[in-house]
């Protein structure tokens, strides 16, 4: 991995009626996007992530996102069954997420320890991935993220074959963007990680652009047109899906209880996403 930072020539890519993208040098074409126009979430593009690692995750709901009619998806915390919850959106599915339903393999009382598989809505390999968003103002109660993940991460020891998790943006603390990660090997004994970059003192009151260029050389990360590091390990050659995440803190701790700060900001904080776009390079 290369911890390089600096301004590089970025190319403006205009999208009619919306904020422009800023892309690395070269020629690009947009191959997928959601501008969040209208007032209803496009369910042909997004589904709600409700389960994780074979269990229904208590932090998530399918009611925590609304479109504001101004081309934004607005994430917020709400109270559900006495618990503060929020939403994650995804364009595909991890094969280990769904809860296991008891069945049999033929006449044998045996089965794989995975739930029902789902067909992905959208996956992609290589290209440039960009999100423009305004971060939550009170991250002491919840966190936000923009990332991609392989549907079959960890199904083999070869990241080229079964993919990685790529964390383009994660915000756990005020003004801080965590280092960008490439995880491989799944989420157990074989898990490995490379990390690079990250910033402090980011202005939380304005929109920012977070991007990643993924190609045969690895992953290059960008914040507001400034390169924030390159990872040349664990290079995936498998199509992956996109996630926009929020999550109340505490549910992943040993007692699986939300932090008290989450209760204090119910209905008082928002994570706002202007757009998500995917670009492919145009071959000369």
For each of these PLM feature ranges, what is it?
Residues 2-284:
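GH16 jelly-roll
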């Amino acid at each position: 991995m290369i911890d390089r930072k600096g301004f590089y020539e970025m190319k403006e890519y205009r999208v009619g009626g919306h904020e422009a993208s800023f892309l690395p040098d070269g020629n690009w074409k947009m191959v997928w996007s959601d501008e969040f126009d209208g007032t209803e979430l496009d369910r042909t593009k997004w589904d709600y992530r409700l389960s994780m690692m074979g269990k229904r995750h208590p932090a998530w709901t399918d009611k925590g996102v609304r479109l504001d009619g101004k081309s934004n998806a607005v994430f917020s915390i709400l109270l559900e069954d006495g618990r503060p919850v929020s939403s994650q959106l995804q364009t595909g599915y991890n094969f280990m997420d769904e809860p296991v339903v008891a069945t049999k393999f033929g006449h044998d009382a045996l089965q794989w320890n995975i739930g029902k598989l789902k067909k992905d809505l959208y996956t992609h390999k290589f290209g440039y991935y960009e999100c423009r968003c305004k971060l939550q103002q009170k991250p002491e109660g919840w966190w936000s993220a923009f990332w991609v993940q392989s549907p079959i991460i960890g199904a083999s020891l070869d990241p080229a074959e079964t993919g990685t998790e790529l964390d383009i943006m994660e915000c756990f603390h005020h003004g801080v963007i965590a280092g960008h990660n490439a995880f491989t090997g799944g989420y157990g004994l074989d898990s490995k990680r490379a990390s690079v970059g990250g910033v402090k003192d980011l202005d939380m009151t304005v929109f920012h652009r977070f991007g990643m260029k993924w190609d045969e050389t690895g992953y290059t990360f960008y914040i507001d047109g400034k390169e924030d590091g390159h990872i040349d390990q664990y290079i995936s050659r498998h199509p992956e899906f996109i996630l926009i995440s929020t999550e109340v803190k505490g549910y992943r701790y040993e007692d699986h209880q939300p932090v008290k700060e989450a209760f204090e900001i119910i209905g008082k904080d928002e994570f706002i996403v202007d757009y998500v776009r995917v670009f492919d390079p145009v071959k000369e």
